[in-house]
Amino acid sequence: MHRYRTHTCGALRDSNIGETVRLSGWCHRIRDHGGVLFVDLRDHYGITQCVVDPDSKAFGLAEKLRSEWVVRMEGKVRRRPEGTDNAELPTGQVELYVADIEVLGPAAELPLPVFGEQEYPEDIRLKYRFLDLRREKLHQNIMTRGAIIDSMRRRMKEQGFFEFQTPILTASSPEGARDFLVPSRIHPGKFYALPQAPQQYKQLLMMSGFDRYFQIAPCFRDEDPRADRLPGEFYQLDVEMSFVEQEDVFAAMEPVITGVFEDFAKGKPVTKGWPRIPFAEALRKYGTDKPDLRNPIEMQDVSEHFRGSGFKVFARMLEDTKNQVWAIPAPGGGSRAFCDRMNSWAQGEGQPGLGYIMWREGGEGAGPLANNIGPERTAAIRTQLGTKEGDAAFFVAGDPEKFWKFAGLARTKVGEELNLIDKDRFALAWIVDFPMYEYNEDDKKVDFSHNPFSMPQGGLEALQTKDPLTIKAFQYDIACNGYEIASGGIRNHKPEAMVKAFEIAGYGEQEVVDRFGGMYRAFQYGAPPHGGMAAGVDRIVMLLCGTTNLREISLFPMNQQAMDLLMGAPSEATTKQLRELHIRTNLPNK
């Protein structure tokens, strides 16, 4: 018989009745029923009920057991007494009648319980993550994460992709965030950087003659804390392909992502034949470039109905041609209480309020806006929006460049408040035609909008002849249920176009050579057209596990202050370590 176990705690069934077995695991729950001790023994695979009678030689030791002690139990498998089956457990028809117990690892008093799913402060959970990971929901999330990554790998290989590993120690590059720097002992005063993404290496692979690359890649970014991103590091399904156009990438990757979602959606419908939504259209209809298409609300430009109208605030705004009025339909939202609630919410978001019209019985418009613009214009708005009796519409006015984010938040808020969002499906879409550049208000200069290595639509000619802020890129995202879960593009594979693209963003040719010397050199020796994408593993797992917190699907995450409370990182380096690296610290004044 094996030293520790003949079966796992999830393995015993009716067919094992009468067998003498050994189980090892953690004491999940201990109960005393009339002098008989019941110990639910748990391991990675499940739970088995173990029974210790007072006349058993193991009873004295069993009385000393406490939660989360690790023990080995030996005994006979027997049928549970009639009426005591537990249908929620695969082992729920049997129990182990214990003859012998060995304590393998006692446990100190627990700082948080493993049994149950009660909430505990996050810092306690992260400090004692090894206990937290024993809890059923989190344990299952981590197992689901592994299975999702397995599904990604299998599907990528079915599509003809080959897995490569790219370097972790690399050179610093301007990719939008700060790098984590690693000092070189051998080259004093010089630093490696941890990769923000394997962007350059995967493009270099295509220039090295490989055709279809992927990896589950760790990425590192020294960013300020954000609610929608884990501090420090995250993982992505990184992909690159040679001799492809945008449609080729879509054709290869849409079945992979759809298939992964279908594998783990638990029966929820998953979009097939994803819509292609241009970036500008996404902002206009949904107020975001990662729309939640489960929300049926589409915003519309209703400026014409307010131009020259009796509502002077909007009418005066519209005298400036850059300004517009957008309507946010609210099906079933035509009550004064709801409209007032939305108005208060808008003020809480730092806005002056939300104008609204309600449509009463008979289709008559009501509310301050309706009174000011009159029944004819109100009816025209109703016709354009397709609203019905009992509906409402909210209005946002000004420069769309400045209000579209708020309009998108208002659309989401209306959808949530009126229960319009179908929570039981996954709505996926391609967002396409991103702008190549944007104007950086802080630095007062043109900057890259997304990936600096993307091919501009129109190529070098567009870079030479067009206003940079009008140039679109062969760049695309995947949106799902209000999250960006992937981003990619067709790459700029011609050196002269690459230099020009960076020049527009304020980088001289020498700086391009210094920053991207390896890739720049590779472009001189025959670079194939290529493109790819990267899908966020963490966000995909989060969606499929039904949580909104990335820490609930990560093994050992940092807290929001980018501290690893379990391992005590970051920590101070020793004087010896700093001396070897020729580094002296210069701490800011507190």
Curated annotation (Swiss-Prot):
ATP binds at residues 221-223, 484, 536-539. It is found in: Cytoplasm. The keyword Cytoplasm applies. The record marks 33, 83 as: Important for tRNA non-discrimination. It catalyses: tRNA(Asx) + L-aspartate + ATP = L-aspartyl-tRNA(Asx) + AMP + diphosphate. One of its GO terms (biological process) is aspartyl-tRNA aminoacylation. The keyword Protein biosynthesis applies. Aspartyl-tRNA synthetase with relaxed tRNA specificity since it is able to aspartylate not only its cognate tRNA(Asp) but also tRNA(Asn). Reaction proceeds in two steps: L-aspartate is first activated by ATP to form Asp-AMP and then transferred to the acceptor end of tRNA(Asp/Asn). Belongs to the class-II aminoacyl-tRNA synthetase family. Type 1 subfamily. Homodimer. This is Aspartate--tRNA(Asp/Asn) ligase. It comes from Bradyrhizobium sp. (strain BTAi1 / ATCC BAA-1182). The gene is aspS.
